[in-house]
């Protein structure tokens, strides 16, 4: 049974518009191919990190994904997020 999820990605701040759009399109395709529905993508903008660095960056671009999917779909997508060098961090929450 599909559940509602929210995933926040922190993306490298040095990506220009075209590579960023390509990254988001790839991620959207991966989710849809694995059965995710109701996908909404929101760009939350660039923010400085609070006194620390992630992979030598002091800021990151926050992108929020809201969707409904099976748990196995989320696990498959997170495997892809782990190996993508443009993504500094991510966190997925199940929404009630």
Swiss-Prot record:
Keywords: Ribonucleoprotein, Ribosomal protein, RNA-binding, rRNA-binding. It comes from the Bacteria. The keyword Ribonucleoprotein applies. GO terms for cellular component: cytoplasm; ribonucleoprotein complex; ribosome. Coiled coil: none annotated. One of its GO terms (biological process) is translation. One of its GO terms (molecular function) is structural constituent of ribosome. Belongs to the bacterial ribosomal protein bS6 family. Binds together with bS18 to 16S ribosomal RNA. NCBIfam families: S6. This is Small ribosomal subunit protein bS6. The gene is rpsF.
């Amino acid at each position: 049974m599909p559940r509602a999820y929210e995933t926040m990605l922190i993306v490298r701040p040095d990506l220009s518009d075209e590579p960023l759009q390509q990254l988001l399109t790839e991620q959207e395709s991966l989710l849809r191919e694995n059965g995710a529905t109701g996908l909404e993508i929101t760009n939350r903008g660039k923010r400085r990190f609070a006194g620390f660095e992630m992979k030598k960056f002091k800021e990151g671009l926050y992108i929020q994904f809201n969707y409904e999917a099976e748990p196995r779909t989320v696990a498959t997508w997170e495997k892809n997020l782990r190996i993508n060098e443009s993504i500094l961090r991510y966190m997925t929450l199940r929404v009630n």
